[in-house]
């Protein structure tokens, strides 16, 4: 893989790790104590991170 392709793979790996961590937070007790607006922002962030990861996976698949 080219250097820019390797960076995309690394970025996808790092993002996947962050998504797992955020998912755990969203299921935890602290999340339920946050105000409604902050919970909404975090849920939207989670969804957008998933979309971002999907695009990275599409890009990586196209490297083949």
State each model region's role.
Residues 1-64:
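Extended, charge-rich alpha-helical interface modules
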């Amino acid at each position: 893989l080219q250097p820019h392709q390797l960076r995309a793979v690394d970025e996808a790996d790092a993002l996947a790790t962050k998504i797992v961590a955020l998912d755990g937070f969203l299921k935890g007790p602290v999340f339920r104590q946050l105000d409604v607006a902050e919970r909404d922002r975090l849920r939207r962030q989670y969804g957008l991170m998933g979309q971002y990861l999907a695009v990275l996976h599409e890009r990586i698949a196209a490297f083949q």
